Amino acid sequence: MVTTSLSLPEIARETRQASRQLAILTNEERNEALEAIAEALTANADKILEANIADVQTAKAMQLSPALCARLELSPSKLKAAIAGVRDVAKLADPLATMQINRELDQGLILRRITCPLGVLGVIFEARPDALIQITSLAIKSGNGVILKGGKEAIRSCQALVTIIHQALSQTKVNPAAVRLLTTREEIQELLKLDQYIDLIIPRGSNEFVRYIQNNTRIPVLGHADGICHLYIDKEADLSKAIRITVDGKTQYPAACNTIETLLVHQDIARQFLPAVAQALEEKKVKLLGDEATRQMINVPSATEEDWQTEYSDLILSIKIVDSLESAIEHINYYGSRHTEGIVSENFNTAKTFSDRVDAAGVFHNCSTRFADGFRYGFGAEVGISTQKMPPRGPVGLEGLVTYKYQLVGDGHIVADYSGENAQSFTHKDL
């Protein structure tokens, strides 16, 4: 952990206390803290990039995967975008103290449901130092403390970022203890046991990593274990659109969890579509795999059962020919990870059937699955993507980091007056 003699439970307790102070600050005070962070990150950009270059060099020397190295790299443009994201979060509406219910139960007895912070977030992530910036800004805006654990491959970048963030917060109303960084793998095990201090764990990383977190804590976990996304090219697709959407969905950022891993193609247009899309993908250095029907039309290696279950996070794409919309939906609902699925079709009814029947957090029509992102949704940023059925679902921004409490105000009201033979009636009138 970063230069402290405190034990992890003591750090978590301090973060809990700091989060309670943060929760009662005004929106203006929280926004001032975000602006201070943005200014400090800008002023110290060279230090951040220098630390990141050292991390990337070490990762390459250790022969870590190209996908991980791509996530790890914090280019000047990436850092600039992350800083802009901090300011975008500050511009968002205040998620706290929103009145969701304002109801008269009886004269003088008023029930209100008010949004409030969750408390303390434990966020564990691999690579992606820009995620630390996003998460911190969302935590502060939503009034939550946050304990961060980055991957060892990003340790220099994360330490530089948190040091700068602490310096910025020390000049604001936000206690720097609201943002803490852990640096050793052993601390993950201990963090997962701190259910008395941590309200939500958010893991970001490989499917094995996320499943490990889910299986080793009593703390609620928000996240997704897999990003196996599909694109279905319908028999009534505009093929030029289909090619552009396929190429973007696979190559725009192959390491992202919303990148397509399997392309499903209707048999009626496969012979016309596959050679054209294969050429476009191969120009982008994508390795293609195909089922037997696909291999009769284009020269590619065989796709196996394992391929339909694999999140490549790389320039690899499996292709399968299907005989109907129903077959495509069946394949997706069996192999998909409930993340993001897409269809290309000019038939509105076909697209609606697909959207209604596919089980996923996001279902897209005639656009790239890469749009599944909190920033692109207008959330300012995201702490992660959730594929679980219980909310929040999909990209999780500010709304997913707040809960609510019921506040009931009366004037000597007691339940005994509302029970028995002469019970008073409730008015239950929304105000």
UniProtKB/Swiss-Prot annotation:
<dbReference type="InterPro" id="IPR016162">
    <property type="entry name" value="Ald_DH_N"/>
</dbReference>
<dbReference type="InterPro" id="IPR016161">
    <property type="entry name" value="Ald_DH/histidinol_DH"/>
</dbReference>
<dbReference type="GO" id="GO:0050661">
    <property type="term" value="F:NADP binding"/>
</dbReference>
<keyword id="KW-0560">Oxidoreductase</keyword>
<comment type="pathway">
    <text>Amino-acid biosynthesis; L-proline biosynthesis; L-glutamate 5-semialdehyde from L-glutamate: step 2/2.</text>
</comment>
<dbReference type="InterPro" id="IPR000965">
    <property type="entry name" value="GPR_dom"/>
</dbReference>
<dbReference type="Pfam" id="PF00171">
    <property type="entry name" value="Aldedh"/>
</dbReference>
<keyword id="KW-0963">Cytoplasm</keyword>
<dbReference type="InterPro" id="IPR016163">
    <property type="entry name" value="Ald_DH_C"/>
</dbReference>
<comment type="function">
    <text>Catalyzes the NADPH-dependent reduction of L-glutamate 5-phosphate into L-glutamate 5-semialdehyde and phosphate. The product spontaneously undergoes cyclization to form 1-pyrroline-5-carboxylate.</text>
</comment>
<dbReference type="InterPro" id="IPR012134">
    <property type="entry name" value="Glu-5-SA_DH"/>
</dbReference>
<protein>
    <recommendedName>
        <fullName>Gamma-glutamyl phosphate reductase</fullName>
        <ecNumber>1.2.1.41</ecNumber>
    </recommendedName>
</protein>
<comment type="similarity">
    <text>Belongs to the gamma-glutamyl phosphate reductase family.</text>
</comment>
<dbReference type="InterPro" id="IPR015590">
    <property type="entry name" value="Aldehyde_DH_dom"/>
</dbReference>
<dbReference type="GO" id="GO:0055129">
    <property type="term" value="P:L-proline biosynthetic process"/>
</dbReference>
<keyword id="KW-0521">NADP</keyword>
<dbReference type="GO" id="GO:0004350">
    <property type="term" value="F:glutamate-5-semialdehyde dehydrogenase activity"/>
</dbReference>
<keyword id="KW-0641">Proline biosynthesis</keyword>
<dbReference type="GO" id="GO:0005737">
    <property type="term" value="C:cytoplasm"/>
</dbReference>
<dbReference type="InterPro" id="IPR020593">
    <property type="entry name" value="G-glutamylP_reductase_CS"/>
</dbReference>
<keyword id="KW-0028">Amino-acid biosynthesis</keyword>
